Amino acid sequence: MIQGLKDWLYLFNSGQDFQSYNRFGAHEVSPGKWSFLVWAPHAQQIKVVGDFNDWRGSPLTRQGETGCWYGELAAQKGQLYKYKVVGPDGATHEKIDPYGFGFERKPGSAARLLDIPRIKWHDDSWLSKRSKWRPYAEPLAIYEVHLGSFIRDTHAGPDGGYMTYQDAIDKLIPYVKELGYTHIEFLPLMEHPLDASWGYQLMGYFAPTSRFGDPADFLRFVDAAHVAGLGIIMDWVPGHFIKNTDMLAQFDGTPCLLYTSPSPRDST
């Protein structure tokens, strides 16, 4: 079990923890063993289904009155998984992990076992410059871009002809530098199922979309941009909440992660 889980769940439930991604979701606790923690207070039962158990389901254990469910399973990095949730009405639905760090390529929606990536950063000079930056006294020019349509091969196959994060290092960064911009602002890069939404209907709040590569690839892009003297701004849209039945809406059989009002103003 994660060290100090009971104490941490107390902090979470009392609103005293602000880095829940370090606990919730899937994390490798030892080589070949992963922990799974999910908040679903109204669920009757939760199982983890994935490549590591032939999608048959391994039950999680309810953690008292915390609303959380926890378990540890033998699994390997890169394998896919979902939660099978039995709601208060007895209906069962497969759901994505709200804290997944990565997902399979569309049209699939399973989360992928990935811990927070670690890369070698080269942007010390940029960070030092940023700490001294005077935003109201120095030039600021922002290039806003939707990476999925910046350069795209419309005749490509099932991969959609998307640029990769590496392509963006090679093509986008020099282009923006040549134009004289100081920052790149991305339209939402978090995981989303529908291309036409431009990323504004989120499913993975903690995962850069797999359309362009894995999370480590994205970090390398940010590093390369900083080395080139460019800041990165992310358009993050937590209010745009996808309602697909296998995602976050009615997650535990109730709108526990969503407004209870059916008004279209409250969610998308």
What would you call each of these model-derived segments?
Residues 143, 184, 232-234:
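Hydrophobic faces of well-ordered beta-strands that scaffold small-molecule active sites
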